[in-house]
Amino acid sequence: MLDFIKGEIVELIPDSVIIETGNIGYMLFISLNTYFSLTKIKSCKLYIYEVIREETHQLFGFIDKKERQLFTHLISVPGVGANIARMVLSSLSVCELEEIIFSGNVSALQALKGIGNKTAERIIIDLKDKVKPDNIPSSDTIITNISSNITKEAITALITLGFSQSASQKVVNKIVSNNSSSTTIEQIIKKALKLL
């Protein structure tokens, strides 16, 4: 079993990264939280979770052990697979998810794509004893102006995650136009994931 991989980032897109180590390129599926942590660096260390089945062998990469632990907790819940767990971790920070589970906020989980009422309740029931928040989520770094590059990058990220271009453009444009205060690309994508 693999615990972590350390190497040079060869390719980085919002849902995956290719890391070269020992002349081998490893493709790892990642959350948007991990993606944003990797955007400004050339080499990294990611913690790994392996999914090995008859028809597939997938590697999931996480920026820290806490994110990996939450992922493993999420996929232990009936009805939550690796893709839904990754979508949850892309929509919420680790601190936000811990706080939602700990406080029993079913409606916050239901607002996420792929999570219905029963699944949200099940996540909270199954994980409430396993998850204890470290602290209250802190606000993200604010970017002074929303530029067209940020809008384009947000749309590209959503398309890469499997959403249609037209739906992605509509949602991102709506978020940007309704937001009189400045915001980050991460905040735009998280809001969009809740609306799609």
Swiss-Prot record:
Record-linked CDD domains: UBA_RuvA_C (cd14332)
Cellular compartments annotated: Cytoplasm
Gene3D superfamilies membership: 5' to 3' exonuclease, C-terminal subdomain (1.10.150.20), DNA helicase RuvA subunit, C-terminal domain (1.10.8.10), Nucleic acid-binding proteins (2.40.50.140)
SUPFAM superfamilies reported in the protein's UniProt record: DNA helicase RuvA subunit, C-terminal domain (SSF46929), Nucleic acid-binding proteins (SSF50249), RuvA domain 2-like (SSF47781)
Region (Domain III): 146-196
Disulfides per UniProt: none
Record region (Flexible linker): 143-146
GO biological process, one term: DNA repair
Keyword tags: Cytoplasm, DNA damage, DNA recombination, DNA repair, DNA-binding
GO molecular function, one term: four-way junction DNA binding
Keyword Metal-binding: no
NCBIfam families listed in its UniProt record: ruvA
Function: The RuvA-RuvB-RuvC complex processes Holliday junction (HJ) DNA during genetic recombination and DNA repair, while the RuvA-RuvB complex plays an important role in the rescue of blocked DNA replication forks via replication fork reversal (RFR). RuvA specifically binds to HJ cruciform DNA, conferring on it an open structure. The RuvB hexamer acts as an ATP-dependent pump, pulling dsDNA into and through the RuvAB complex. HJ branch migration allows RuvC to scan DNA until it finds its consensus sequence, where it cleaves and resolves the cruciform DNA.
HAMAP family with a match to the protein in the record: DNA_HJ_migration_RuvA
Protein name as annotated: Holliday junction branch migration complex subunit RuvA
